Regions:
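Extended beta-strand/beta-hairpin segments
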Residues: 1-45, 55-134
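Alpha-helical metal-binding/catalytic segments enriched in His/Glu/Asp
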Residues: 50-51
Length: 134
């Protein structure tokens, strides 16, 4: 699995991955044009949408209307470091949602591939074209 990162101008950074070009930019206060999400935005979005696709698949397999499930993700940051310390998935279920599937729905969302990377984080290595590793 590989990704190519490019710099098309300004504070924009693009990533070509799995046949898609994902565009990012910085906010105006950080010198960008605010023309696309920031990399951090996409990071947070990936957590919510990952849990969301697991919830959607769970509902579809059981013929449950997915509009009966609303997910709101809350990120709590450390005030000094600004690092996220807690991610809370608030799952709002409509009265029509079958009670017998509540626990199973949450368990399915807990299988999120992105979330699992927090539980078992990868190692990061930087290598230059002259094989210097950092």
């Amino acid at each position: 699995m590989k990704m190519e990162v490019s710099f098309p101008g300004g504070k924009r950074v693009y990533s070509d991955f799995n046949g898609f070009t994902v565009e990012t930019d910085q906010n105006e206060k950080d010198g960008g044009d605010n023309s696309a999400p920031t990399p951090s935005d996409l990071f947070f979005v990936s957590i919510g949408t990952c849990a969301g696709i697991y919830a959607l698949n769970f509902c579809e397999k059981r013929n449950i209307d997915p509009t009966h499930v609303k997910i709101e993700v809350e990120f709590q940051a450390n005030q000094k470091s600004n690092m996220i310390e807690k991610v809370i998935f608030n799952v709002d279920l409509a009265p029509e949602y079958p009670e017998k599937y509540i626990s199973a729905l949450i368990k399915s969302m807990n299988l999120c591939y992105v979330k699992k990377h927090f539980e078992q984080p990868p190692q990061f290595e930087f290598v230059t074209n002259n094989d210097v590793k950092f």
